[in-house]
């Protein structure tokens, strides 16, 4: 019983771990560091190339529910994230380097996993395989997958935010607070007056951007939209978006700022901070010039500039089943952002389901289709039931889950949906596993 997993990102690492935990021998292929991508910086597994946040912890948030469901299956990614988390108020954020290093250690030390660092350019259709090559799939493998699925790849762009050193932030201006007072005050906040914001806004929308290739249409995912593109929607868009000041009163003045830029810890030591919501494709000198206009960041030292990259994904509703298996070729599974799920936790979830099912298929057991009342099942259902004519990446959200049978007050509806999901998942586990 041998399973091939192609791609050592979040989905591939989770898929390999889940299958290995079922007693299956796994060959996990990762091309880095032999061959790298435009977005990756290291050769470690499960490298986080965008934010260091796995989003909300609360069960009143769908991402919080999905994380809790993953923990029920001893998810490798969740286990490591919980071990290396950094303070981030109501969110689960991690030390970026420690996270990928620890995932790599778990994989390398697992007796049932062989980690092979080389590029895969062919897919053996007779060999049970999980394809988790990510949104930056290499050209040669993209062509092979297109032949397998019989469809062209779709694509969108997303971007990463810059990171600055803690010591270069002016703490006489920036202050600690968490929005609405939720959790501990783990965010550094840079306040802006109306005049400061308007000056910053003009510089931002007029700054030079890295051009796209002339033949490529600019399609961006809302959750990773460049800050300058968001600003172009209107002068107040940022003030009602990532720069909203609500709940962040400035203790130095006792007043509510006109706008606030939040910075979140990027490593456990607290020496690095990322600019929350500042994904960008501005040219690097422009990032330094424009972002130093933010009060408190006048002397900011940038250790990583924001970058933008092209993400590709298959038209899953045309080709996949709800257990992430290729309809026309049983035994071949897809997982991660290449399927059209969007986000770290969502990629992990698809890897978990694909890895479990690949192992079960190898062992001659029935594959699992998760109940759609669960976050795991709702996400998988979206992937196969969305319109193939306009298929777009999707984060987990309560809108994907069925309505409650009984009407409840709006303020407790999400909590009740989470309670139902976890109860149904427990019953599903007892019945099927």
Curated annotation (Swiss-Prot):
Cofactor(s) named in the record: FAD
The primary location reported for this protein is: cytoplasm
Name any GO cellular component annotation: cytosol
Enzyme Commission number: 2.1.1.74
Catalysed transformations (reactions): uridine(54) in tRNA + (6R)-5,10-methylene-5,6,7,8-tetrahydrofolate + NADH + H(+) = 5-methyluridine(54) in tRNA + (6S)-5,6,7,8-tetrahydrofolate + NAD(+); uridine(54) in tRNA + (6R)-5,10-methylene-5,6,7,8-tetrahydrofolate + NADPH + H(+) = 5-methyluridine(54) in tRNA + (6S)-5,6,7,8-tetrahydrofolate + NADP(+)
What role does it play?
Catalyzes the folate-dependent formation of 5-methyl-uridine at position 54 (M-5-U54) in all tRNAs.
Q: State what protein this is by name.
A: Methylenetetrahydrofolate--tRNA-(uracil-5-)-methyltransferase TrmFO
